[in-house]
């Protein structure tokens, strides 16, 4: 019954208005308010502040600034092996595997289409996927899983349903309904996409090359092309791509059938830069 009420509320809550109000609070630079919110989050979500590069909450300019905190150097080591694809984020590896007949697994018994996710029917090369859920306690920066060059970024407007196990099991096409940002990269294995999926209460999605893109900055699909001589935006595996100002989900799409995942089952905890998959010879 509790889950049904939660799902019902997801459909009647004004997603954009709620997220904008939360964003105003999260961006407040009032010292007393932001310190209260930070301390509340640390206590409620059991955030390990000792992992942060800056452990003094007074040094954070806002609640958002705290949520996109950097980690201590060397805390998430990364493999130098070029055949290892690393995790782009801290969180839970909620689903992963093959893209079968153009569909990805959302949760047990539920699938959604690649076409709906990326709002593009012309791309058919993606054959593997991994979905990582970032809870409020997790580190919120997203990193590059493999060496690559940015070729395109696509903003897709949408809803802002909460993203968690309950909504994944009960809201059809959840990740294809929510607002999202699809970043395409040219890599040695072909085209790879890293997708930032928005959610209720997520105060923003930002990238290091563009700045803030969401929530609901645009009413229509927006496309930025970077695959020309005017741009040369390259990333090494482990470089920071961007961040969420609260928590949500990252989906990585990969093109190569010779990729094998390093996990046997879903819902495993995973850390950024941890080995996610292996590129076979």
Swiss-Prot record:
The modification Pyruvic acid (Ser) is found at residue 248. GO terms for biological process: phosphatidylethanolamine biosynthetic process. It comes from the Bacteria. Pathway: Phospholipid metabolism; phosphatidylethanolamine biosynthesis; phosphatidylethanolamine from CDP-diacylglycerol: step 2/2. Keywords: Cell membrane, Decarboxylase, Lipid biosynthesis, Lipid metabolism, Lyase, Membrane, Phospholipid biosynthesis, Phospholipid metabolism, Pyruvate, Zymogen. It is an enzyme of class 4 (lyase). It holds the Pfam family PS_Dcarbxylase. GO terms for cellular component: plasma membrane. It catalyses: a 1,2-diacyl-sn-glycero-3-phospho-L-serine + H(+) = a 1,2-diacyl-sn-glycero-3-phosphoethanolamine + CO2. Binds 1 pyruvoyl group covalently per subunit. The record marks 247-248 as: Cleavage (non-hydrolytic). Is synthesized initially as an inactive proenzyme. Formation of the active enzyme involves a self-maturation process in which the active site pyruvoyl group is generated from an internal serine residue via an autocatalytic post-translational modification. Two non-identical subunits are generated from the proenzyme in this reaction, and the pyruvate is formed at the N-terminus of the alpha chain, which is derived from the carboxyl end of the proenzyme. Its cofactor is pyruvate. The active site is at residues 90, 143, 248. It is a peripheral membrane protein. InterPro entries: PS_Dcarbxylase, PSD-B, PSD_type1_pro. Its EC number is 4.1.1.65. GO terms for molecular function: phosphatidylserine decarboxylase activity. Catalyzes the formation of phosphatidylethanolamine (PtdEtn) from phosphatidylserine (PtdSer). Heterodimer of a large membrane-associated beta subunit and a small pyruvoyl-containing alpha subunit. Belongs to the phosphatidylserine decarboxylase family. PSD-B subfamily. Prokaryotic type I sub-subfamily. NCBIfam families: PS_decarb. This is Phosphatidylserine decarboxylase proenzyme.
């Amino acid at each position: 019954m509790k889950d049904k009420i939660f799902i019902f509320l997801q459909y009647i809550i004004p997603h954009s208005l709620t997220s904008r109000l939360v964003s105003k609070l999260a961006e407040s630079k009032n010292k007393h308010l932001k310190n209260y919110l930070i301390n509340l989050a640390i206590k409620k979500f059991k955030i390990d502040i000792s992992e942060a590069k800056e452990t003094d909450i007074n040094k954070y300019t806002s609640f958002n600034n705290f949520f996109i905190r950097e980690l201590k150097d060397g805390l998430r080591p990364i493999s130098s092996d070029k055949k290892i694809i690393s995790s782009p984020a801290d969180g839970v590896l909620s689903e992963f595997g093959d893209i079968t007949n153009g569909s990805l697994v959302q949760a047990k018994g539920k699938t959604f289409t690649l076409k709906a996710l990326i709002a593009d029917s012309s791309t058919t090369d993606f054959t593997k996927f991994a979905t990582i859920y970032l809870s409020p306690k997790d580190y919120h920066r997203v990193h590059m899983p493999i060496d690559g060059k940015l070729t395109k970024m696509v903003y897709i407007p949408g809803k802002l349903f909460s993203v968690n196990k309950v909504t994944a099991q009960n809201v059809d096409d959840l990740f294809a309904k929510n607002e999202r940002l699809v970043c395409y990269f040219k890599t040695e294995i072909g085209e790879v996409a890293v997708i930032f999926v928005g959610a209720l209460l997520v105060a923003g999605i930002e990238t290091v090359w563009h700045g803030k893109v969401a929530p609901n900055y645009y009413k229509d699909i927006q496309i930025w092309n970077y695959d020309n001589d005017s741009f040369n935006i390259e990333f090494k595996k482990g470089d920071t791509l961007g961040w969420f100002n609260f928590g949500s989900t990252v989906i990585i799409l990969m093109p190569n059938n010779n990729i094998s995942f390093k996990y046997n089952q879903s819902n495993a905890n995973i850390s950024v830069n941890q080995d996610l998959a292996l590129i076979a010879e």
